[in-house]
Amino acid sequence: MSVVSMKQLLEAGVHFGHQTRRWNPKMEEYIFTERNGIYIIDLQKTVKLIDTAYNYMKDVAANDGVALFVGTKKQAQDAIEEEATRAGQYYVNHRWLGGTLTNWKTIQSRIARLKELKKMSEDGTFDVLPKKEVAVLTKQREKLERFLGGIEDMPRIPDVMFIVDPHKEQIAVKEAQKLHIPIVAMVDTNTDPDDIDYVIPSNDDAIRAVRLITSKMADAFVEGKQGQDDAQQETADDNAANETVSEDSLKNLKNSVEGKED
């Protein structure tokens, strides 16, 4: 049984691509049709590719792997943080700092500074410092927390990265490629899929679409880490409660779908 149902994908708006004038020709094989100037993603392929990505993420987790979830666009920030945390993994959901992976030693020194500032605020050090100095240190801590809080406890370079919108996260993609870190990503119709190891053709702008697919990747890690079928059983229960969408229904998308904002 598939990890996610066609109905769930439709309801989350996963099938809405970008406007036809903003497309990458390499995504053609993942496009079902065009409607009102909007490309419609072939959800039959998305279902299969989610399964492939899920199984890969699960295998990485089962081998005690480390995952880094990346999504800095507003629509992805909450889902990235919440789902990575639920899976016991790590995340970057604000600006990607250049060198986060390729200059890991320097980043670790900034993380050490973040931990030092946290300790100072908790052990009473701030109470004996001048207010102006405390204000400066607090601002520094908040900035470090914003950009590095999600990887503060990451033990090493990740074994896999899940990325929402690799077109936006090009610096992260290039760093992963340089270090040969496999990438699983939500890839919209305006993105080059050649940079991605495990492509999930999907609307990467809709909050519900991002939440749905990010949660499935987190489920995969939870299942792999636990060595149990809890997440898979939840998926099966969800799918059993959903109506199936026939191939005829999918073909009728071109007559019923509404376009999304560019």
UniProtKB/Swiss-Prot annotation:
Region (Disordered): 224-262
Entry's Gene Ontology cellular component terms: cytosolic small ribosomal subunit
SUPFAM superfamilies noted in UniProt: Ribosomal protein S2
Keyword check for Ribosomal protein: yes
This protein's name: Small ribosomal subunit protein uS2
Originating organism: Limosilactobacillus reuteri (strain DSM 20016)
Family matches, as InterPro entries: Ribosomal_uS2, Ribosomal_uS2_bac/mit/plastid, Ribosomal_uS2_CS, Ribosomal_uS2_flav_dom_sf
Family: Belongs to the universal ribosomal protein uS2 family.
GO molecular function, one term: structural constituent of ribosome
Gene3D superfamilies the UniProt entry points to: Glucose-6-phosphate isomerase like protein, domain 1, Helix hairpin bin
UniProt keyword annotation of Ribonucleoprotein present: yes
Superkingdom of this protein's organism: Bacteria
One Pfam entry name: Ribosomal_S2
Keywords: Ribonucleoprotein, Ribosomal protein
GO biological process, one term: translation
